[in-house]
Amino acid sequence: SIGSAFKKALPVAKKIGKAALPIAKAALP
């Protein structure tokens, strides 16, 4: 179902977000 897929994707999205945060900060002037 959509709910189970969303629950599986949520922790992955959080990991990607944490990984992207320092990259985004470094990219900013």
From Swiss-Prot:
Transmembrane segments: none
Main location: secreted
Thermal dependence: Thermostable. Still active at 100 degrees Celsius.
GO biological process terms held by the UniProt record: defense response to bacterium; innate immune response; killing of cells of another organism
Protein localization: Secreted
Gene Ontology CC, one term: extracellular region
Keywords linked to the UniProt accession: Antibiotic, Antimicrobial, Cytolysis, Hemolysis, Immunity, Innate immunity, Secreted
Subunit text: Homomer of four to six subunits.
Role according to the record: Female-specific peptides with potent activity against Gram-positive and Gram-negative bacteria. They have as well hemolytic activity.
Protein name: Ceratotoxin-B
Annotated gene: CTXB
